[in-house]
Swiss-Prot record:
GO biological process assignments: cobalamin biosynthetic process
Protein name stated in the entry: Adenosylcobinamide-GDP ribazoletransferase
Cofactor: Mg(2+)
Listed Pfam families: CobS
Location of the protein in the cell: Cell membrane
EC number: 2.7.8.26
UniProt similarity note: Belongs to the CobS family.
Primary location: membrane
Gene behind the chain: cobS
The species this protein was found in: Nocardioides sp. (strain ATCC BAA-499 / JS614)
A GO molecular-function descriptor: adenosylcobinamide-GDP ribazoletransferase activity
Amino acid sequence: MRDAWRFAVGTLTALPVRPPTRVDRDTARRAMLLAPLAALPLGLLVAAVLAAGRAVELPPLAVGLLAVGALAASSRALHWDGLSDTVDGLAASYDPARSLAVMRSGTSGPAGVLATVVVAGVQAAALATLLDQPLLAGALVCLSRCALWIVCCTRVPAARADGLGADVARTVPLPVAVLGGLLLSAVGGLVVLVLVRRTVRRFGGVTGDVMGAAVELALAATLLAWAAR
């Protein structure tokens, strides 16, 4: 369990932790199951930013943007990189090999940049409506990591034989993936399902980038659903 915790925290946050001594399929499965709990420090950070912004009466949208920035910094913007690369891959070609090569190149194209701006804007605008409910916002940040349960479901193949995606793909049991969809809210779960279906058809499976994209899209959709209540 210690290795799984180190794997989850070290992969999903910028917190300094010792690397796991061993990473096998069981460690990867436990790490993905621990993902929402590993994100607890990130959720508390977002809650603190919202509470502080409200206390000093900053403009709500500015506070939302600061919260998104703090969240990105606390996870090394890893999920944002995944979102950008995934959208670039989807926009690049219908050839799976070429799309995967574009994703692996590490450069951001116009499609990826636009997707990042739009999703970040949605997150910030939704967080701006939750200034009086900072703990709820923090909880939603943690729950957004349940998207990884869906992407890493045993029914979803990996697009590559190497990389982070291959390490954690097909590790989460189907009942847990279904629970993850329910915890995300109908909208968040649906968005992740659409992403998974699309990437499996286009790439032949999921990658670490797709997992990052799923987290950011799930957070945006879930925050928006709560903001619309």
